[in-house]
Amino acid sequence: MRVVTFNLHAGVDGWGRPTGALAHLIALAPDIAICSELWRGDDGTDFVATLTDTTNLRGQFVALARAERVTTGHGPRRWQPLLAHFTGERGLYFREHRELTPQQREHRRVRPQVETGEWGIGLFTTLPIESLEVKSLGRLPREKVRRALIVARLDLDGRSIHVLALHGAHLSHGSPLLLRRVARIVAALDPVPPIILAGDFNCWRPLLRVLLPGWNSLARARTWPGQHPHSQIDHILGRGPWRRLDAGASDGGSDHRALRADVALDELDVRTLG
């Protein structure tokens, strides 16, 4: 079974130029796809429709913010403005809970062609779906978007498994509080089925082991920033008798790399679980 988690950044870079992120995800042929920063345009590009129309993937999309996606961006070769983390990027605009920066307002003025739509997270799979549930994680005070956990129960060759999709907050915005909420949801699940928890955690693996103990990493590879990665902040975590067959990360044009893990359930451990 192939699990892929990929932050698609709505299919544009930090200047609003189109990327091939969605095509890259589809080319990886996942059995389970955890998609952060999916885009559903009001009158244009719809990533969910593309996924379900061109593949056998089915699942759940959760809108976490209204946004504007720039469609006329241009800029230098770098993926986004050099100081984008301080002045804001120029590819996506979120205004529900925070004002745009002066630099963003100026760019919005001179690059008026934008597409409005919904920005969010998705969990899609080719496996039979037993149940799907969305757990709200709220919005942290410093955040410009809401957060949610998608909880799926799937059938893998006659065995039930849980798969959870998360796009976590940054540490500076209060991610420990968010991860405590995730831990409480996990603790309330049926303890028998093996679990996979995957997504863009915005958190390094050493810290994640402290904030979310008791998980095994099913894929270890640098995922951020996408062009010259030095850190892993996207993760595929497992509980239960998962066995990693292969794993890696690949550049699909986004600011994160796509992380994949080919995994199997250990037959002996599954039988002992009854």
Regions found by a protein language model. Give the residues of each.
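Active-site regions of metal-assisted phosphoester/phosphodiester hydrolases
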Residues: 1-32, 41-43, 58-60, 66-67, ...
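Glycosyltransferases and closely related glycan-assembly transferases
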Residues: 48-55
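A short beta-strand element within the Helicase C-terminal
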Residues: 37-38
